[in-house]
């Protein structure tokens, strides 16, 4: 679990967000280390708990709240031969040019080469004449 700060209006348990990097005001903020220092650009986070601590912030309409976040499970298309529940693999994105499936082919929050654990097989999906498995994965750190 990671402690960070989010805008007061976004501080709701269950909310997911992608961290894209620091804003200009963050570079001189005294809270930057706790706010953005624990987050990795391009990763998806899910708020699991909102604490009753707030701080002023010029970026987030006046206030930020202290929250606890985790990286959630993410759905991604995978070659069927690698889709084994419980296995850990190095993520390799499939080739699929269907715009409707873009978020499943290269979901935000995951990068090519990430070590992931396959949690669940969700569905069979066809794309470009090929059959893939839609799986739910969790990124392994370290």
From Swiss-Prot:
Q: Which family does it belong to?
A: Belongs to the UPF0179 family.
Q: Which HAMAP family match?
A: UPF0179
List the transmembrane segments: none
Q: Which Pfam family, any one, appears in the UniProt record? A: UPF0179
Per the record, the domain of life is Archaea
Q: Which residues pair up as cystines?
A: none
PANTHER family membership: UPF0179 PROTEIN MJ1627
Please identify the protein, giving its name as recorded.
UPF0179 protein PH1477
């Amino acid at each position: 679990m990671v402690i960070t700060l989010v805008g007061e209006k976004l501080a709701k348990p269950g909310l997911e967000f992608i961290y894209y990097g620091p804003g200009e005001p963050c570079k001189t903020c005294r809270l930057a280390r706790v706010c953005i220092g624990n987050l990795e650009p391009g990763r998806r986070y899910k708020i699991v708990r909102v604490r009753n601590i707030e701080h002023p912030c010029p970026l987030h309409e006046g206030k930020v709240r202290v929250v606890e976040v985790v990286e959630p499970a993410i759905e991604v298309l995978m070659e069927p031969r690698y889709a084994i529940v419980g296995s850990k693999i190095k993520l390799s994105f499939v080739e699929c040019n269907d715009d409707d499936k873009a978020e499943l082919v290269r979901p935000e929050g995951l990068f090519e080469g990430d070590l992931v654990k396959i949690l669940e097989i969700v569905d069979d999906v066809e794309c470009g004449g090929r059959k893939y498995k839609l799986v739910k994965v969790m990124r392994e750190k370290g």
